[in-house]
Swiss-Prot record:
Source species taxonomy: Bacteria, Bacillati, Bacillota, Bacilli, Lactobacillales
Pathway note: Amino-acid biosynthesis; L-histidine biosynthesis; L-histidine from 5-phospho-alpha-D-ribose 1-diphosphate: step 2/9
Pfam families to which the protein is assigned, alphabetical: PRA-PH
Protein localization: Cytoplasm
Keyword Isomerase in annotation: no
Annotated organism of origin: Streptococcus sanguinis (strain SK36)
Keywords from the UniProt entry: Amino-acid biosynthesis, ATP-binding, Cytoplasm, Histidine biosynthesis, Hydrolase, Nucleotide-binding
Name of the protein in its database record: Phosphoribosyl-ATP pyrophosphatase
Length: 104
């Protein structure tokens, strides 16, 4: 499904269509696209905090769509993302807590 989203976003970039929301986003440019990515990411966080599975699924779908548009706009392919994910698979993470901030 992610590939389908990406291919549809790519097609709309190459073949703009009157009245298309995707074409509208491309016309407005990267800043508008990234604003939507940020908004949708925030809505995913809220849905998760609300423990609303339906809202979570819907907002995640919106986020994935806007990420696909952002990838196309910035010239990053899904294959490039997959390569990064595959390279990370099985690697040990360097997770650690950040030091407390005591000077403001």
């Amino acid at each position: 499904m992610l590939e389908t989203l990406y291919q549809e976003a790519l097609k709309r970039k190459k073949e703009p269509k009157e009245g298309s929301y995707t074409s509208y986003l491309y016309d407005k440019g990267l800043d508008k696209i990234l604003k939507k990515v940020g908004e949708e990411a925030t809505e995913v966080v809220i849905a998760a905090k609300n423990a609303d599975k339906n809202e979570m699924a819907n907002e995640t779908a919106d986020l994935l769509y806007h990420l696909a548009v952002a990838l196309v706009e910035t010239g990053v392919s899904l294959e490039e993302v997959e390569t990064v994910l595959q390279a990370r698979q099985g690697k040990q993470s360097r997770i650690h807590d950040r030091p407390e901030i005591d000077h403001y």
